[in-house]
Amino acid sequence: QKFNQIQSTGNPEFSIGIFQGKTAFNVVKLRKIATQFGAKSIFVIHPRYSDKKPFDEAEKELSRKQQQLCPFIEYIDFNDFAAKMDEGWVLVGIEMGGTPLTDFQHPRKAIYILGAEDNGVSALAQKACKYIIEIPSVRSESFNVTCAGAIVMYDRSLKYLT
C-alpha cells in the first residue's frame, strides 16, 4: 500500500484545529498539511489574529476541490465548538505532559485540538478531551503549532497504514 493512497483505502476520519490561534499564517500552513493527510476539516476556536490577509490570500490559492475536501471552520469559543461537535467523535488534546505520541493509539474518528504556543490548550478544553497526548522531545519548549499538527497527522497515518 502506497503512502499517497491512504485516504482512498479507508483512512479513518479526523479533523484538526487550533485553540486561540495567534497567526493566520499558522492556520494556513496547518490547513495545507491537513489536506495532504486527508483531514475532514480544519478549525480555529476563538482566534486571536487580527490580520487575516495571509489567510485570505492562501484561500485564493486553494482550488475549489481542496476547499471542499478540507473546509475551514471558525468557532467563537470552546462552548460554541463543543455544542457543534458531532457524536461519535473523540476529542484529543495535544499538550505537554500527556501520553507520549509514540505510545498512543489514535481513535478511528478523532478531533485533534492544538494550543497556541504561548497558552496551550485551555483547562476547559483539556477537561473535555478523552485523551491528552504529547510529542516527545529533547527540550522542554513547545513545538510550533503547525509542526506539532504535522507530526501528529503523520503519526496517525503511519499507524493506520500498517
Tell what function each PLM region has.
Residues 1-95, 157-158:
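RNA substrate-binding interface of SAM-dependent RNA methyltransferases
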Residues 53-58, 104-105, 146:
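Short secondary-structure transition/capping segments
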Residues 78-83, 99-101, 140-142:
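A short acidic, often aromatic-flanked loop/helix-cap motif at beta-alpha or helix-coil junctions
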Residues 125-162:
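Structured adenosyl-cofactor binding patch, chiefly the S-adenosyl-L-methionine
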Residues 96-127, 132-135:
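Active-site/ligand-binding-proximal alpha/beta "capping" segment
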Residues 19, 45-46, 116, 133-139:
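Short beta->alpha connector loops at strand-helix junctions that form conserved
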Residues 25-26, 120, 143:
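Residues that form or flank phosphate/diphosphate-binding pockets in enzymes
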Residues 27-28, 107, 145-146:
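Conserved strand-to-helix beginnings and helix N-cap segments that scaffold or border functional pockets
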